[in-house]
Amino acid sequence: MWFKNLLIYRLTQDLPVDAEALETALATKLARPCASQELTTYGFVAPFGKGEDAPLVHVSGDFLLISARKEERILPGSVVRDAVKEKVEEIEAEQMRKVYKKERDQIKDEIIQAFLPRAFIRRSSTFAAIAPKQGLILVNSASPKRAEDLLSTLREVIGTLPVRPLTVKTAPTAVMTEWVTTQQAAPDFFVLDECELRDTHEDGGIVRCKRQDLTSEEIQLHLSTGKVVTQLSLAWQDKLSFMLDDKMTVKRLKFEDLLQDQAEQDGGDEALGQLDASFTLMMLTFGDFLPALVEALGGEETPQGI
């Protein structure tokens, strides 16, 4: 279990439930298939394993892992629009009258209900790691919407969830721009070969660089004309590489082979043991990586009133 993306949230108070109570709470909103007339469903599933006995909360030392699954019926908008248009034209031709918005909307609703049972189904899962002692929730997603879906549903089942996105004192854009300009990153961080540069004007240009020497004159010229770094590929120690963006989202997270080999050795021959070992090692690595990242970005900013 290696996360590929990271959205970082700060618990502003202690988590109001322990692992056992959390297990009970998640069981009140289990993931389930869409009924024939449902567009979407959302609920919790076991992060590891299948079957009724698989726990909804995986506990490893001081860390908890949960997973939510969304199931949705896919109705292409173009298909619905074409069907509505065809039905409206049929009514107007047969009844010699104009179909207005209210009736058109009703026709659309009827067509959606008729198409729903035949629609394709898409499933997607979102994992979140909870580190109560560190006061963090880490969501394995680069989409704030998907993270908020999980967090709001978690809040619903436990009654309260005092959490906010972790913020830093120095804007990531300012720090990343300085690192590329000076060709020197914070201790243990290394600039790699990919970045995105944006003009500070609203309608300014965007330059995306991949497999390029970011110390080159071309890059420095873009920076000297006012562009700033909004995404930057980085490595930390010899343990992981990632892409950092201007909103402090960690994307394309990749753990180096040394860590993965260690997890394989620690996990034994069973699949569950391998998953547990990789999750534990990942969280221990985050325990060093995240404080270093926050410090490199000027330290954590606590909003007023919190």
UniProtKB/Swiss-Prot annotation:
Its main location: cytoplasm. InterPro entries: RdgC (IPR007476). GO terms for molecular function: double-stranded DNA binding. Keywords: Cytoplasm, DNA recombination. One of its GO terms (cellular component) is bacterial nucleoid. One of its GO terms (biological process) is DNA recombination. It is found in: Cytoplasm, Nucleoid. It holds the Pfam family RdgC. HAMAP family: RdgC (MF_00194). PANTHER family: RECOMBINATION-ASSOCIATED PROTEIN RDGC. Belongs to the RdgC family. May be involved in recombination. This is Recombination-associated protein RdgC. It comes from Pseudomonas fluorescens (strain Pf0-1). The lineage of its organism: Bacteria, Pseudomonadati, Pseudomonadota, Gammaproteobacteria, Pseudomonadales. The gene is rdgC.
